[in-house]
């Protein structure tokens, strides 16, 4: 199984170009895209944007039970329409059957078609953090879509961390939380150090010019490949994929030669945003039923640290589903494949009471 850095790129491109085809093939309604503008949006820095554009995709009718699904870093909402995710969840009789659920896939601030530095402000764009991103999602859901309650918030990687933030900041707004490939604790250890290497590498690139570059700094692509290999893919899966030096060289060379279309400012902002993430102090405020899903071979969130078990003790009724590592898993990217956990989510929704909306 290829590492997530390649999978997500391919999945995102496929979702963008073949949304309608995938929907028909997977037997769920054709996704619909929309935009909403949050007026006078205040960032944690105190800066205010008079008009913050938020793009989103929905699957299903607004009359269905609303479900918010949050993508990972450098993705967009349409990444979650990848067949390995959506085709396992949104079809008839599946855990998030779109004939019963109203599925909301936002492009989080700085990503996709939502407002981001490359739209024109470049390095003058406000430096957002995860709290800002979640606050924008809340405004989109409550003001833009007119919803008063969510049945479920589910997120992957960055989206998983922001799922924890949702539970802390808006504890009575949802019935259930499914944070995936994440920990409810501050950035630390390898996870943060690797993120620093991405952002510092871009800032130290000779072409950077404080974000006012004339050509895209090469460091963004090189550091992206480095980070992807170091923090995604799974040990056993990589050994199977590249069992010799020749195979490993080819894999690396292919990734370095692959098209890289990300803007360096966008990329830096996306990774920088996690710096002050830390939901731990507020975990006891969570009211929703929590099912955390991680994989045993997650390079960013290794289970042997015991962090998840320690913090879950403070979440009433919170529990962890840990996917065993194997040649068929892909480290941090394992949970992007819904086949590994869809049954657990179905059982969660069957047993979690619905609150009044």
Regions found by a protein language model. Give the residues of each.
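Catalytic active-site module of serine/aspartate enzymes centered on a nucleophile-bearing elbow/loop
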Residues: 318-357
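Alpha/beta-hydrolase-fold enzymes
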Residues: 173-257
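Short beta-strand/loop motif that positions the catalytic acidic residue
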Residues: 286, 292-294
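Conserved hydrolase catalytic core segment
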Residues: 148-188
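Active-site nucleophile elbow and catalytic-triad environment of alpha/beta-hydrolase enzymes
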Residues: 266-282
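Conserved alpha/beta-hydrolase "acid-adjacent" motif
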Residues: 299-306
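Conserved acidic catalytic loop of the alpha/beta-hydrolase fold
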Residues: 131-151
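N-terminal cap/lid subdomain of alpha/beta-hydrolase-fold enzymes
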Residues: 57-119
């Amino acid at each position: 199984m290829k590492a997530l850095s390649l999978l997500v790129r391919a999945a995102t491109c496929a979702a963008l170009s073949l949304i309608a085809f995938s929907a028909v093939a997977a037997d769920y309604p054709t996704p619909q895209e929309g935009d909403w503008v949050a007026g006078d949006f205040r960032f944690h820095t105190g800066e205010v944007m008079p008009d913050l554009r938020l793009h989103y995709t929905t699957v299903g009718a607004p009359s269905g039970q609303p479900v918010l699904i949050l993508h990972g870093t450098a993705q967009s909402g349409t990444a979650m329409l990848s067949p390995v995710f959506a085709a396992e969840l949104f079809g008839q009789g599946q855990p998030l059957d779109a004939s019963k659920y109203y599925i909301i896939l936002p492009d989080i601030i700085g990503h996709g078609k939502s407002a981001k530095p490359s739209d024109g402000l470049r390095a003058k764009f406000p430096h957002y953090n995860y709290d800002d991103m979640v606050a924008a999602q809340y405004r989109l859901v409550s003001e833009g879509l007119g919803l008063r309650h969510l049945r479920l918030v589910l997120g992957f990687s960055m989206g998983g961390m922001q799922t924890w933030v949702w539970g802390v900041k808006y504890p009575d707004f949802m019935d259930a939380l499914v944070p995936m490939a994440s920990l409810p604790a501050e950035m630390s250890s390898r996870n943060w150090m690797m993120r620093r290497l991405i952002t510092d590498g871009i800032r130290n690139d000779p072409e950077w010019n404080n974000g006012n570059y004339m050509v895209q700094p090469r460091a963004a692509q090189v550091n992206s490949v480095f980070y992807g290999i170091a923090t995604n893919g799974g040990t056993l899966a990589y050994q199977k994929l590249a069992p010799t030096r020749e195979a490993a060289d080819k894999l690396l060379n292919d990734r370095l030669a692959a098209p890289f279309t990300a803007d360096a400012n966008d990329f830096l902002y996306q990774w920088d945003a996690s710096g002050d993430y830390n939901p731990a102090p507020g975990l006891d405020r969570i009211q929703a039923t929590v099912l955390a899903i991680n994989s045993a071979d997650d390079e960013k969130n290794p289970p042997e640290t015991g962090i998840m078990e320690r913090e879950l003790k403070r979440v009433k009724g919170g529990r962890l589903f840990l996917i065993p590592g194997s040649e068929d898993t892909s480290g941090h990217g394992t949970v992007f494949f819904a086949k590994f956990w869809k049954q657990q989510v179905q059982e969660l929704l069957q047993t979690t009471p619905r609150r009044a909306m």
